[in-house]
C-alpha cells in the first residue's frame, strides 16, 4: 500500500501531469497526420503544431494541471471518440452523422457494436481514464505548478502558436478550399457538433415546418381496380452479394425463379447512413435537394392524398427521427420491436403477418411501406439457425481473421431476405390485384473486403461496398398486361445508372399512377422519360458531391469498373 501511494504521488507531480495531459490530448492529431493522406503535408503538419500548441497554452493558464484537464474534459471525450472511429474506419474525423448516430442508434445496436470494438474501447480507457483519475487526485491534493515553469512553458506554447498560425496562412494561400473549421482537429469536430445540434433542432421542428404542405395528389388509374403497391426498404444489403447480381453463391434462389422480377444493375445509394438514406427513400428529398425534407411531407402522404389506404410497418425501433415522422403519416403504422421483450430478436418475417392482415382487410387502394432489419450487424442474429446455409458462421467478433465467418453469416442474411421478398410477392400474387413491389436497401456494408480491412458502414468516407445497393421491381401479371408501357420502360432502364434515393419516390408514384406537381418522370425508372444524371453523394455537411470528390480510393474505382458501374 505504501508503494502504491508513493507511485500515485510520483505520477501526480504537477510537471509530469502537465506533460502527460498535453500528450494524451495530442494523440488524435498525431494519428490524423498519418491517416489523412488526402490533405497536403503543410495542412497535416499544421494540424499537429497549432492545436497542440493551443492545448499547451491552455495548460499554462492555471496553476493546477489536474483542474485544467477536467475543464478540458469535452476535448478528452473527443479524443477518445476520435481514436475509436479511427480504429473502426481507418481515417477521417468525427462527422456530424456520428454525433447524430449517438442519438438515433438504439441501445441494442450500440451494445452489439461496442462488444466487437473491445480493443479500441480498452485502448482509450487505458489512455484517458488514468489521465483523468490522476488529474482528479492532483486537483484534490491541491498540487500546483511553479510560476517559473508556467512562464517558460507559456513561451514555448506561444512560439508554437505563431508557427502554427504561419502554417495556416500558407495553407489558405496554397489551397483554394482550405478552411480551419473543416480541416483542423479539433476545430472541425466542434463545428460538426454545432451542425449536429442545429440539425437535431430542425428535425424536432419537422411537424411545424411541414404542417401546411400538400402534394395536391390525385389518382390516374381506374378507381374500380384493386391496387396494391409495396415499398420495401432493406437494411445494410449490398448488391454484390446477391445471386441476382452475378454473385458466385446462390443467395437468391427464390427470386431467381420469380416471374416479373426486374433487377437494376447500376444503383447507388446517396448516403451510407440509415438516418439520412431512409428519409430520402420515403420522400422527394435527394442529395441534390436534401433540405426539402424539412419542408415537405413524405411519399405516404402523397398516396393518402390520392385515395390510398396507407400503412407503415418497421422492424426497427423508433428513435424520434425523420423515419418515424414520415412513417407515422400513414393511416396505420407499427414498430414491431417497440413492444417486444427487451433483447428479443424479431425476424423480418413478422412483417409478413401484418401485410397479410392488411391484404385481407380488402382495401381497394392500398400502399404498404416495410422497413426491414435485413442484414444489419450482428449478422448471425438476423436469421434462424434453419437458414444457416453458408457455414461456418458462428464467430461474430469484428476481426479480419473472422472474415470467412462474417461473410458466411452475411450471405445467410441475404438468402433470408430472398425468402422474405419471395414470400411477400406470393402474398401479392394471391390477391389477383393490380400490384407492384419495389425493394432497395438504404446502404451497403464493408466486410473486410480488401487490404484496407474496412468494416461496417456509415464511415465518413464511403466505399464501393457501401454504395452499390440492390434495386428490384416486381410487377404482377395483371399489371404487366394492363400497363405494357411501364413494363417496357422498366426493362429499358434496368442497366442505366440510377440514384436510388432520388428515384424511389418518383418511381413509386409512377407505378401507382399518382399524379402530383412534385412527381418528376425524368427520375422514374418506370418511365421512358427517365434521364441519366450526374451521380452525387450527400456528404456529412448535407452537400451534394460528385463521386470523384468524396474520397473513393483506387480499390473502390476498380470495383466500379469491374461491375460495369458508371463512374463518376
Where are these regions (language model features)?
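Membrane-interface soluble catalytic domains
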Residues: 8-20, 64-68, 301, 318, ...
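A long, amphipathic alpha-helix that forms part
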Residues: 55-56, 353-356, 394-437
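Transmembrane and membrane-interface helices of multi-pass
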Residues: 1-185
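Active-site-proximal alpha/beta segments of enzymes that process anionic O-linked groups
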Residues: 160-231, 236-397, 500-501, 506-531
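Flexible internal linker/loop segments at domain or repeat junctions
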Residues: 386-403, 479-489
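Histidine-centered active-site microenvironments of extracellular/periplasmic hydrolases
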Residues: 246-250, 433-434, 440-485
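Active-site rim elements
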Residues: 42, 179-180, 287-290, 341-342, ...
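Metal-dependent active-site segment of extracytoplasmic phospho-/sulfohydrolases and closely related
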Residues: 230-231, 413-456, 505-509
